[in-house]
């Protein structure tokens, strides 16, 4: 068995069965089951779901959406990713699988916006996300380092 990797999840009934394993493991606000069912009904071929399989079973998942423009108060200009939900089965938590999912999103080189749910602020801090408080709630934002380095290199020239 090879090392687990992040892959885009297919929108089908097999994935729906895998998602049912997560029901009851986490908070209701993390449930993606209804979201996946809606995508199956709409026959949406562009899956927003990513996951990690281990031993043939889905052990970690996230939903990731491309947004057009963040604007103010989010400190994002232009397109960005919204990492809407991330969940790892309890048996596999604290083993780096959540970080693997986030790193996969970071490799796309767009700013990322997320909400720290269920005592996860420390997780987002560790992954270099910055907290942003607005009237709608508290968010965490990550900016691609390449953009920051480009500015730094120009300033030093």
Swiss-Prot record:
GO molecular-function term, one example from the UniProt record: acyltransferase activity, transferring groups other than amino-acyl groups
Keywords, ordered alphabetically: Acyltransferase, Transferase
EC main group: transferase
Transmembrane segments: none
EC number(s) per entry: 2.3.1.-
Key word Transferase present: yes
Keyword Acyltransferase recorded: yes
CDD domains, per the entry: NAT_SF
Domain N-acetyltransferase residues, every copy: 9-154
Xref: HAMAP family: Acetyltransf_YlbP (MF_00824)
Protein name: Uncharacterized N-acetyltransferase BC_3921
Species assigned in the record: Bacillus cereus (strain ATCC 14579 / DSM 31 / CCUG 7414 / JCM 2152 / NBRC 15305 / NCIMB 9373 / NCTC 2599 / NRRL B-3711)
